[in-house]
Amino acid sequence: MGGGNMFTRREFLKTTAATGALAATSGLAAPAIAQDAAIKLGYVSPQTGPLAAFGEADKFVIDSFLSTTKSMGLNYEVVVKDSQSNPNRAAEVAKELIVDDEVNLILVASTPETTNPVATTCEVEEMPCISTVAPWQPWFIGQQGNPGDPTSWKPFNYAYHFFWGLEDVIAVFTNMWSQIETNKKVGGLFPNDGDGNAWGDKVVGFPPVLEKMGYALTDPGRYQNMTDDFSAQINAFKSGGCEIITGVVIPPDFTTFWNQAKQQGFAPKIASIGKALLFPQTVEALGNAGHNLSSEVWWTPSHPFKSSLTGETSSQVAEAFTKATSRPWTQPIGFAHTLFELAVDVMKRADDPTDSDVVAQAIAATKLDTLVGPIAWDGKNLPPFAAKNVAKTPLVGGQWRLKDGGGYDLVITDNKTAPNIPVGGKMEAIA
């Protein structure tokens, strides 16, 4: 059988359902979805495993979404799946949502290890998918058949993504570094995963930009996640005279690295780390040693945006989370909330929520002001190859500051990349 004639299981289900409906109505086409049938959303995120901090707010966001839509007279069902922080599991549960649960749209969040296998599965199965919380390069390039050959890259028909890119995080980090006097020697912590390979890439990652800006990068090579000994990296950074550390590290690994760096007498002036330092619990786990660690900041209670679904401000959503959970707010709250804002907006505009092509077209036509800023897949500030499938959101930089009574505050220290997001202070050296 030629590849062109291969039926996806989804097409088979759609065709048999349609012929069944026609037969049952003696030739009169039935409406595509019964008036009172729920619109079914699938949601995938890492709720357990080393990436679980990303999924901490999911239950709160989904519970709020279901009560909001119910009060608006909208009928939604959300089928939640845990990727267990495992890419193979993420692909499996995406297939389950499509084949067994027959969802109308899949939403997925948090790191390329979650977003990519889900988006790839959706693309193959012709299931519309909206993803977030992974820089767009590892999301888009990482799903290509040949990531090393840009001429072979193809856009997607069903997978759409919103977040910032490596160009943004590099700008944010170097803007923060320029506020402090250093020898411009940088140590890179890049693991052997989707993010690490992209951030450390000699073409799209940190190396070429840092070189152009006069920074000397010491990159000891890719390491495996869940490493328990960072002595080789620490020795390389000491030998290189590094006063700045950067990289993209999963939360448990940064705790190991930072504790070992302290024990081995390595004390950089700046540590700007992606991924690990997004979360208060990672910083709290370091005791006082988390003071003045810096990170990318994609959403905070002071972001000047409102939910299109509830009208709540960023600060109201963050307060509601803390009230419901007794936990400090975390950055993924804003993006998880926005996934559901987009779902409602898309389904409102899709004439037939059960038709994958109609839903995908509605996603492509989105123009929505959300809790994380304006979202439109219009190609703005993107290279042509990613213009169809990626929408960019703003990024700033911040530092964790010890509070008098214990715990930490995240203070925005640089907003050159998004001046509408207010700063709360200036960069301070760690030591």
PLM regions: where:
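C-terminal segment of N-terminal export signals and the immediately downstream linker at the start
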Residues: 2-6, 28-46
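N-terminal secretory signal peptides and thylakoid transit peptides that target proteins
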Residues: 4-23
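Beta-alpha junction/loop-to-helix N-cap segments that form part of ligand/metal-binding clefts
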Residues: 53-60, 68-145, 162, 223-230, ...
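Extracytoplasmic ligand/sensor domains, especially the bilobed periplasmic-binding protein
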Residues: 103-220, 270-295
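Hydrophobic alpha-helical
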Residues: 112-123, 228-229, 235, 240-264, ...
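Extracellular/periplasmic periplasmic-binding protein-like sensory domains
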Residues: 136, 261-337, 349-350, 413-419, ...
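Segments of small-molecule ligand-sensing domains
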Residues: 320-333, 344-410
